[in-house]
Amino acid sequence: MCIRDRKKSEGLCVVSFSWIFAIILASIPYLFFGISPVDALFEATSGITATGSTILTHFNYPNTVFFWRSFTQWLGGMGIIVLFIAILPQFAIAGRQMFFAEAPGPTEDKFTPRIKNTAAALWKVYAGLTIIEIAFLKINGMSGFEAVCNSLSSISGGGLSPNSQSMIGCSYPLLWITAFFMFFAGVSFNLQYKAWVKLNPLVLFRNEEFRTYFSAIFLIGILLSISLFFNMHYDLAGSITHSFFNVSTLVSSTGFCSVDYTKWDYTSKLLLFAIMLFGSCASSAGGGLKVMRWLLVFKIIKTEMTKILHPKAVCNIKTGSYSVPKEILDQTLMFVAFYFVILGVSAFLIAVLEQNTTIGLTGAVSAVGNIGPGFGAIGPLGSFAPLNALTKLILIFDMLIGRLELIPILVLFQKDFWVLKR
């Protein structure tokens, strides 16, 4: 194994074991409140990976428990490893390789020359948005404690709320404020930083991935609003508000809810399930397959169709002005295939264990995509507590590999990874 490969392996190894260690540490406080070890591990994994699934069946715990849940999500949203690099300069083992492993999804570039500067810049945007959201929620009538917890949860793409009803019953202004910040939780923080530096929001719309992300939310939001208006008989304001709130929460993998959408009609639930698979932008706090990968997959399909019609055509696949190398395209196809294999296997195992295909399918999608709630018994007002212990362990594994984008965890199971050749 060459020096470069070994450094990359070190980065992957440190990332994986740091997350596992962080999850174990995060689970300890739950044990003091009578929560079983498996459930404590599940809740901690859900927090650190910013998934938002919960095993809590009541909310009679002290506020410290709910703050801890929200804080673990906030740390996990951008990535504990990036935080370490930003505040612990002496932690310099394979720094760039760790950022490569941690940054979610394929990225266009590293926008500052030093990795520590990059991490610090990302955290300035992340912390700044959090503080702004807390202020807006408090000004619009939310209690100070809930404003802090919900802001930590929404900007991280987590979704664990101190309120058993999530955000059901909140005023429309509170829902729109939260939806706005959830939307940006799913936007590349690299891109947001550039927009802040240039004081020009139009920078966002020059990015192809952002335009696709924005368009998908707008399109699904409009279709869902129409469905709610005609099929569920919401008024116009209610249909638009609940539509865009719940689309934003699922596409950014946050997991809040403004209503129990499991009671919606089939068409509305199908639209929500579609946006669950879509995912957020690369280098965002959100989860899912990532918009950039969908873009590349569709461009690959379009290119192959062109080659069928014009065999001698020379086709380059680009994102913006960047020509994507074949190696990245191959990796993207491999990742997408592997992603759906993991989803399929997990859904099958969970469906068999729970004897419920809805729990199996939506549970796997929500765990690997770090979304949080699914449909049925594990919907936004449900709990994962009644599930089989083995099901919870499968979901824990899914949440972790989903947050680390499959490869850093799965590569640990390769024998060659542990063999250091000269």
Residue ranges of predicted features:
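Membrane-proximal intracellular helices of multi-pass ion channels
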Residues: 4-422
